[in-house]
Amino acid sequence: MPAYNEEKNIGTVIEQWYPVVERIGGESRLVILNDGSRDGTYEMIRKYQKKYERLIGIDKPNEGHGGTILRGYHYAVDAGADYIFQTDSDGQTLPDEFWQFWKKRK
């Protein structure tokens, strides 16, 4: 999940999406890539990492949305992910919408 200047939203987004990761189980992770935010986005991610062991926060220089998504895909592939689902950190996609994709994965 790419994140840029989402300090005000990222906590809510984590709280919404983390139960999806827990429900899937196994080696599932919620990976958020901070794209060089100038606000407290990464600090918020780190705060939530203390609460959620399956949350991975990655801080990196700004590369823009596309570059950050690509970096996230590379991270997931290198980590051996069987499935990758990408959504943005602005809260526009709701976790309930995920399950229709998950059911079609086979």
Over which residues does each language-model region extend?
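Structured catalytic core of nucleotide-sugar glycosyltransferases
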Residues: M1-K106
